[in-house]
Amino acid sequence: MGKIIGIDLGTTNSCVAVLDGDTPRILENAEGERTTASVIAYTDGETLVGQPAKRQAITNPQNTLFAIKRLIGRRFEDEEVQRDIEIMPYKIIKADNGDAWVEAKGQKMAAPQVSAEILKKMKKTAEDFLGEEVTGAVVTVPAYFNDAQRQATKDAGRIAGLDVKRIINEPTAAALAYGLDKKGGDRTIAVYDLGGGTFDISIIEIDNVDGEQTFEVLATNGDTHLGGEDFDNRLINFLVDEFKKEQGFDLKNDPLAMQRVKEAAEKAKIELSSAQQTDVNLPYVTADATGPKHMNIKVTRAKLESLVEDLVVRTLEPLKVALADADLTIDGITDVILVGGQTRMPMVQAKVAEFFGKEARRDVNPDEAVAMGAAVQGGVLAGDVKDVLLLDVTPLSFGIETMGGVMTKLIEKNTTIPTKADQTFSTAEDNQSAVTIHVLQGERKQASYNKSLGQFNLEGIQAAPRGMPQIEVTFDLDADGILNVSAKDKSTGKEQKITIQASGGLTDEEIEAMVQEAEANKDADKKFEELVTARNQADQMIHGTKKQIEEAGDDLPTDEKEKIEAAITALEGVKSGDDKEAIDAKTQELMQAAQKLMEIAQQKAQAQQGAQAGEQPKQEDDVVDAEFEEVK
């Protein structure tokens, strides 16, 4: 089995790691960075990912997509999506199936399709390091992701050409990275994960029994729409409001200006983690009839904290719930680990320390721990890591809708996965010949307040008084936290099974079409790369030949010179075009035309070498070799 890589597919940044021996190693991308910005830009004929995409965002805001993870597995009508529509510079649209999609360069795309571009870059980074093709991956998701979001993440992997061997929760992955080298006594750790777009808290018990380490998740909680992007947006809104007060101009109507403000706000937020004050200085941020407008606003750490305090406080309630679900008090927590870039904010660190009554550990890299843990799990699945057992849980309860619009739970939240549960139900009316199984995920008693995962019918039930037929419903939850459901009429043996796919989500046909499109683009990308290489070779050939013509001077016969210059002109005429074969052919013609030039250059070089050899001083005949004695 080949290497199974670990990928942290983040809202703001993504990261890839691989097991190197028995140690997880973070891999640098083509730009030499250990993390890759989760930004995708569509330009004329090219798709940019990471820093190159981020760099051109100011001039191309409508076609530069970021924070796509906030849309993955989401419905367009979701409250969180509607909030994002108001603040995102790019277009969020409603797909035919009701999902939240995006539009760039006139093309409509599903969130998994866009996320696949990031996964492709992670895959390529790993392949460049390993020198071989990579197909297997462990991909992390927020612990509080629901079934639809997990399924959509797997779909993204498939579109990127990856076989996602396992989906694991981000806090669990961080615990794996932290605990792998910690031998000794048992510990219970709290992983507080505040990333770019999501927040999770997991309580994890690490046991050492006879040399085997068991990582058991006791409870998890969180908010899949709370993260660094929300902190950024608070600061962006403050800057825009201040500018409006000073200049009487609303920047929200200017996408280019808003992109500059967004970048400046991100930078200011990061600076305020180490400084008490920073200046947001944007000359020529916009202009009107009176002339150019400049932004120059001082922001203090205290001001930023006042803008986001309620967001930080919002993370504390899930901590209380997770502790209660784990049947623990704060005294039972051995260590606190902070994961996610937003945990670098001093206020976040202070609030967490205040809650747990202890400082968080400083020996975990908040940006890299999750990918490292995913690589460890990849090693476990590949059989490279022994004596490590991971027991994760489902973050939310699963059930079905029963009479009166009630949700009846079959699998409770925080149940260790994989797991299986069944329950027998009956009909609500006399002589009922079919039942609809409506599958739900959530904690509310009223079915309509929970997430609908889909529904199916079991037909052909024998006529009988209500309450007599016995219908066995089985829920089978796999290690990725994805659900399979079956319903069986015990009297007839008739059975109906489905793998839960939310009422939205991508069909197998749609995923396959996207895989084919990705493959087609792969060929197009390869051809583009080959074209650029041919152009570069042509440029080098032209430059080198012109230089040799100068150096040859009068030694080059006029007719030869004219022949070479004609070949140069011919190559210059095609090198900027898109016909690689034409560029290669004209490059070859120039090489042949310049044959005489090569000969002259070679003759000159040989003559020069001969002259240098002739100038070397002759050894004098009367020089006597001295004898010497080694003194020991």
Curated annotation (Swiss-Prot):
Pfam families, per the entry: HSP70
SUPFAM superfamilies recorded: Actin-like ATPase domain, Heat shock protein 70kD (HSP70), C-terminal subdomain, Heat shock protein 70kD (HSP70), peptide-binding domain
Organism this protein belongs to: Aliivibrio fischeri (strain ATCC 700601 / ES114) (Vibrio fischeri)
Positions of the UniProt region annotated as Disordered: 601-632
Annotated InterPro entries: ATPase_NBD, Chaperone_DnaK, Heat_shock_70_CS, HSP70_C_sf, HSP70_peptide-bd_sf, Hsp_70_fam
Record-given protein name: Chaperone protein DnaK 1
Keyword entries, A-Z: ATP-binding, Chaperone, Nucleotide-binding, Phosphoprotein, Stress response
Transmembrane annotation, as ranges: none
Single GO MF descriptor: ATP-dependent protein folding chaperone
